[in-house]
Amino acid sequence: MRTLDKRIAPNVKLAASLVARAPTLTLAYDARCKSRLAATLDTGEDVAVVLPRGTVLRDGDVLVADDGALVRIAAAPETVLLVRAGDPLTLMRAAYHLGNRHTPVEIGDGYLKLEADPVLADMLRRLGTQVEPTSAPFQPEAGAYGGGHKHGHDATFAEDYALAQQVFGEHHGHSHSHDHDHDHDHQHGPGCTHGHRGHDHH
């Protein structure tokens, strides 16, 4: 089995013909956050991905195998929420509230995109946005800090999310119980906050 153990820096320009001939490894966002991964190229070949801890792969990245061959990374379509608003201020408010909850968000021209979450979808609709579940590649913003950062869910996060859950439960006639007394103090790579949507911890 070949091992993909190097990522070519984004500022290094490769010949387009080389990249075009490279096989593709299509991965969802959670998989692109993992530094150790068993995966299958689109050609059907099984490979091992072994990268420095904290590496977050993006669509279009190029990896180098231990035999010198190139492999191109593609972001796989996955279930996401596409968020739009009638005015920029409403969309900005939505982005603020999502950021306050440490939610990975892709920011585009007139839209936000996040992993599917019924509690957050309900909150976003209450803020006045239009929320549409769809299947699309997900590429959230990289973190503002250069290296991996360490944090747990603080009291503000727990209170905010508990309130969101309560509102969701009242609106839908049922509630979702999610414990937050377990430890979340672990390392993440830059911009990689998967598993911190409050109730989907892997």
Curated annotation (Swiss-Prot):
Q: Name one GO cellular component term.
A: cytoplasm
User: Where does it localize?
Assistant: Cytoplasm
Kindly list any coiled-coil regions of this protein.
none
Mind listing the GO biological process terms from this record? protein folding; protein-containing complex assembly; urea metabolic process
Region feature Disordered, mapped onto this chain: 171-202
Q: What does this protein do?
A: Involved in urease metallocenter assembly. Binds nickel. Probably functions as a nickel donor during metallocenter assembly.
- Tell me the protein family, please: Belongs to the UreE family.
Q: Could you tell me what this protein is called? A: Urease accessory protein UreE
**What species was this sequence derived from?**
Burkholderia ambifaria (strain ATCC BAA-244 / DSM 16087 / CCUG 44356 / LMG 19182 / AMMD)
